[in-house]
Regions:
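Active-site region of glycoside hydrolase catalytic domains
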Residues: 1-42, 66, 85-87, 95-446
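A common structural microfeature
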Residues: 6-8, 55, 72
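Active-site mouth loops of central-metabolism enzymes
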Residues: 43-57, 131-134
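Internal amphipathic alpha-helical repeat/solenoid segments
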Residues: 54-63, 84, 94
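Catalytic domains of carbohydrate-active enzymes, especially glycoside hydrolases
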Residues: 57-78, 287-292
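Glycine-rich, proline-tolerant flexible connector loops at the mouths of alpha/beta enzymes
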Residues: 77-90
């Protein structure tokens, strides 16, 4: 088995998690700057004030990525750094920073993939309602159009939103991500609608400004895989099922809206609230991307119970898990990309996949992360099988470097590159070398 000849091998990062120095050169506050100052919100009181110092060390990191033979770098631009007040008065110094990042990628033979929203909402917009306010969607579209016009000809791949599901669930429902709210269902549906409108409006703004660019969205959500071949239909149906109790962390709540122009939950309060979405709003949301990014980490094993009712099978004692206690389930790569491709019929990219390990510097000065190599090997083997049934065109490891892992702070390490935070020294982990070989051989070594 092998991947397609033009398969994209890359790594990913985000602005707040890596850059640090958000106020440098006239940058504005984001909701994460404010959230991190609230006691008890982030492990160990950590924040993104320094992060990996990517603001000053981006050239080193891009150089390391290029040295690994990776062809693409997915990163986000901080809306707050470029548009401090969310009012369209652009901070030229912030824009010039991303000029340097993009030009550095191109100089190193690396294709930049630009994510326009990876949760860096200007705090000024949160104070006027954030994603509860439709005006935020319109302001984001203005930002996206400006960015596309500015980088047209240098950036050929734009992603509108990263994981709207997580913005909604962790930021506005559970309150464990910025802005730290706990809203009720009607308010959550309003936030969802504005996020989907933001995709639709920004998609059109990017298309108008950079007609040749490819535009995607990065989705996440529950993934189910069958216990046996006889359970595949049940696992597929459960992957796309929407209920009042289980709708925010699902792919169809985003992808059905943008790809199909409709969302059809089971009977309940959610269905009633969605019935108030106007035909014009559905039309705006319905902006079919050129590709779908899938952020894939783990899933659930499903069997068909009596009358086909899905049964979530318990994980056996000692089941493999990551340092974050996320289960290791490579089966999702074999099945769920086929499920997604069959439903949406669009090219797919793995825009995030990786794990947190208890990485440390060994006595020999190196970082030996055998768990990450094994994880990647298993997931890529399964993805090879998935490629037989789906149009999968690339894989971006999450993440390029260790970084600020949101409410977990710096306790979790996802990178191919180890960051010694006191010194900001970078060390290639063993997994980086393994992944580099995999990219060179286009996966033939898996």
């Amino acid at each position: 088995m092998a991947f397609r000849e033009d398969f994209v091998w890359g790594a990913a990062s985000s602005a707040y998690q890596t850059e640090g120095f958000p106020a440098a050169d006239g940058g504005g506050e984001s909701i994460w700057d404010v959230f991190c100052r609230r006691p008890g919100t982030v492990a160990n009181g950590d924040d993104g004030s320094a992060a990996c110092d990517g603001y000053h060390r981006f050239a080193e990191d891009i150089g390391l990525l290029a040295s690994l033979g990776l062809s693409a770098y997915r990163f986000s631009t901080s809306w707050a750094r470029i548009d401090p007040n969310g009012d369209g008065r652009w901070n030229e110094a912030g824009l010039q920073y991303y000029d340097r990042v993009v030009d550095c990628c191109l100089a190193n033979g690396v294709t930049p993939w630009m994510t326009l929203y990876h949760w860096e909402l200007p705090q000024a917009l949160e104070e006027t309602g954030g994603w509860q306010d439709r005006g935020t969607a319109e302001r984001f579209a203005r930002f996206a159009g400006m960015m596309a016009a500015h980088f047209s000809g240098r950036v050929s791949h734009f992603i509108t939103l990263n994981e709207p599901q997580i913005v909604l669930k962790l930021g506005y429902a559970d309150g464990i991500h910025a802005p730290g709210k706990r809203l009720l269902l009607p308010e959550l549906v309003s936030c969802w609608k504005n996020l989907m409108l933001a995709h639709g409006l920004s998609f059109r703004a990017i298309r108008n400004a950079a007609p040749e660019a490819l535009i995607g969205i990065a989705s996440t959500g529950k993934l189910c895989y069958p216990h046996s071949p006889a359970d595949e239909t049940t696992a597929r149906q459960e992957t796309f099922r929407l209920t009042d109790a289980d709708w925010m962390f699902t792919h169809p709540i985003v992808l059905d809206a943008v790809c199909l122009g409709r969302v059809e939950p089971e009977p309940g309060a959610l269905r009633g609230l969605l019935s108030a979405v106007t035909p014009a709003e559905w039309d705006t949301m319905h902006a079919v991307p050129d590709f779908i990014g899938v952020n894939s980490y783990n899933g659930s094993e499903i069997a068909a119970g009596p009358d086909g009712v899905p049964v979530y099978l318990p994980r056996p004692q000692g089941f493999a898990c990551t340092a974050l206690k996320w289960p290791v389930t490579p089966e999702i790569m074999a099945y769920d990309f086929a499920f997604l491709f069959d439903r949406y019929r669009l090219p797919l990219y793995v825009t995030e996949c990786g794990l947190s390990c208890n990485d440390h510097i060994f006595l020999d000065g190196q970082v030996h992360d055998a768990d990450r190599i094994d994880f990647l090997h298993r997931y890529l083997l399964a993805l090879c099988r998935g490629c037989e049934r789906a149009d999968v065109r690339g894989f971006f490891h999450w993440s390029l470097t260790d970084n600020f892992e949101w409410h977990s702070g710096y306790a979790e390490r996802f990178g191919l590159i180890y960051v010694d935070y006191p010194t900001q020294k970078r060390i290639l982990k063993d997994s980086a070398r393994w992944y580099a070989q995999t990219a060179r051989e286009n996966g033939k070594n898996v």
